[in-house]
Amino acid sequence: MRKAEKPKGAQNFMDMHARLYPGSCVKDITFIVTHRCNLRCTYCYEHHKGEEKMSLETAKKCVDLLFAEDAKNAPLVNEQDAHGLILNFIGGEPFLEIDLIRDIMAYFLSRAIELKHRWAVNYMISMSTNGLMGDDPRVRQFLKEFEGRVSISVTIDGDKAAHDACRVDCQGCGSYDRAIKMFREVSGPDGRRQTKYTIAPGNLTLLASSVRHLVLEEGVDTLHCNCVFEEGWTMEHARELYRQLKTVSDMIQENGLDTYVSILDWDAGDHVPDTETQNWCGGDGKMLAFDVDGTILPCLRYSSLSIGNQPVYRIGDVESGLAVRPDDVARLDALRRITRQSQSEQRCLDCPINQGCAWCTAYNYEKTGTPDKRVTYICDMHKARVLAQCYHHNRLHLLDSAHAAKAMNVPQDWAVEIVGEAEYEALRALEREATGKNAVEMRP
């Protein structure tokens, strides 16, 4: 039986590259072009914004370093691990520095052509924007110039009420009416529409109505959504998340939609075997980020823009190089030694539904002072998500037997605390009907 999958039209650059060049990888390179933003989103993890911006001189040094590292087949940048590049431009709001971004791309391509380098063709531009500068003629020209090479994600947090609850400007005014215009003008591959919805305490109660708006009114068929990792979630939030996701599931099925909503993905809620040691995060050299001053970071969230009072967790800079200084080497080595086991409490390792429970290594560092201590504020939200997934996929299975049924591995006491005894028994009955197993056999 098949599991729920992303729509086939939503294949990304990494997917295509893997098919064209088996065994080689695409590397994610981020340019933090500015710390400035024209919004003040209440849930934003970049809570130390300022006026800093990258100079063109620094940006050119970043580009030169990438080509130099590749030329010497360096451990972090080489033909196998960086056969292709995804060039991410981020802020702050990246389009505030659209002129710089254009200059960076011009220099990058001129160097690639000069060197007859594979990156002249094996690259993609990725940008996430709040959409407020969609009417700027410089932005429009850039998108036209790099059409087919640039992937733009305009963040829309659902309907106007949900979006404006958290995504406000410097005057505290909502931004939906300004952002939705660019969102409607920007489509993904094959004209498909996708966006990212960040679930936070301030907009949780509007989740279902927001998904309905995005899917039925705005034509979104791929919706990436997750709960913020930060502190602030309560058991009541977990109960509300289950209610909201159940409503989302009903809406999808009642309308016969093939919509992909990531938080309802099938692949969560089992137990990860003890032999699996992989860290959730790729911030150990798999990604690289250049901050505005040319400091090299394991990922953008290690920027002073985000981590605040913690020392910058750098692994190099454009002057001294990538992982050359002893302290940079030590930090990179420390990241690479992190495993699922080293950073997790025993209760997380023993959890029967720990598959799909996410964390952020950089937020670990921001909150605890070490990237090797896992922060678990989303624990109850993950439990609620898994319960909703069981509801969603077992009902889908009853409508279409090709859709895989889902065992409910959530312990009874955990489930009852979130959904209550009656709903728990209803979920078990649904599971029995979908899987054909008896209740005693399935009970954790």
What is the predicted function of each stretch?
Residues E231-I307, A407-P411, V416, P444:
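A C-terminal junction/extension of Radical SAM enzymes
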Residues F67-I90, E97-V228:
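Radical SAM/AdoMet-radical enzyme domain recognition
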Residues C37, F89, G294:
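Conserved, mostly hydrophobic/aromatic
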Residues G23-K61:
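Canonical Radical SAM [4Fe-4S] cluster-binding loop centered on the CxxxCxxC motif
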Residues L65-I90, R374-V419:
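Short Fe-S-cluster ligation motifs
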Residues R243-H271, Y302-P352:
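C-terminal accessory region of radical SAM enzymes
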Residues M1-T30, P75-D81, P444:
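N-terminal [4Fe-4S]-dependent radical SAM core
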Residues R36-E46, P298-R301, E345-Y363, M381:
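Local cysteine-cluster metal-coordination motifs and their immediate loop/turn environment
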